[in-house]
């Protein structure tokens, strides 16, 4: 399995399905909103994938790759993992483990203003490392706060294919930009 799930779908720039103010606070490091968003995301995710989660022997959760400073999505992932492990414990399952996609970033450009092709070109110069032996054959949840162009997912899938990593992969997002008519800088 290789699929994605997003809690909120952004179809219009004028009608955001979540509080933009709260999201801004979250992006600037407010952990309370990270915790609230993680709970909302977890609850919605479990409605769709709860039965599949309970069938897994081992679950690996991977936050979005970052260089050295944890991002807001990293905190979202941490709180999501906390919710997941509480659920697993209450169902007599093993706790999810965390792995990391290591990234050596090669640019200082404002990534947020780029479209899909520009993003892929830019991040293709970065180097990535993933412990394929650790995640191989496992059910992996790759978590990020928002899917804008899909370049992150594209790059991670490319890495998984290059390293011939076998397993089940689900990309989980708090929000996803659906309309391609909206500029990525939204």
Regions found by a protein language model. Name each.
Residues 1-60, 66-70, 107-132, 186:
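Active-site-facing substrate-recognition patch
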Residues 2-18, 154-186:
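PRPP-dependent phosphoribosyltransferase catalytic core
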Residues 29-48, 73-87, 153-158:
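Well-ordered, non-membrane alpha-helical segments in soluble/globular domains
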Residues 62-64, 143, 172-174:
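Short hydrophobic segments within beta-strands
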Residues 65-74, 146-154:
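Gly/Ser/Thr-rich loops at beta-strand to alpha-helix junctions
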Residues 82-97, 161-170:
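Structural alpha-beta junctions
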Residues 87-139, 154:
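Short, glycine/charge-rich flexible loops or terminal/linker lids adjacent to PRPP-binding catalytic cores
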Residues 132-170:
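A cross-taxonomic marker for long C-terminal extensions/tails that follow the last structured domain
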């Amino acid at each position: 399995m290789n699929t994605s799930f997003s809690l909120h779908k952004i179809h219009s720039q004028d009608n955001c399905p979540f509080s933009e103010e709260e999201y801004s606070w979250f992006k600037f490091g407010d952990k309370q909103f990270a915790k609230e968003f993680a709970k909302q995301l977890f609850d919605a995710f479990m409605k769709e994938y709860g039965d599949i989660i309970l069938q897994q022997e081992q679950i690996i959760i991977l936050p979005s790759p970052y260089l050295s400073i944890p991002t807001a999505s990293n905190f979202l992932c941490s709180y999501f993992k906390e919710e997941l492990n509480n659920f697993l414990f209450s169902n007599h399952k093993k706790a999810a483990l965390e792995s990391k996609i290591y990234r050596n970033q090669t640019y200082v450009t404002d990534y947020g203003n780029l479209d899909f092709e520009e993003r892929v070109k830019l991040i293709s110069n970065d180097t990535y490392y993933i412990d394929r032996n650790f995640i191989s054959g496992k059910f992996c949840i790759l978590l990020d706060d928002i899917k804008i162009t899909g370049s992150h997912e594209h790059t991670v899938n490319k890495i998984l294919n290059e390293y011939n990593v076998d397993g089940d992969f689900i990309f989980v997002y708090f929000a996803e930009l659906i309309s391609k008519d909206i500029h990525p800088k939204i």
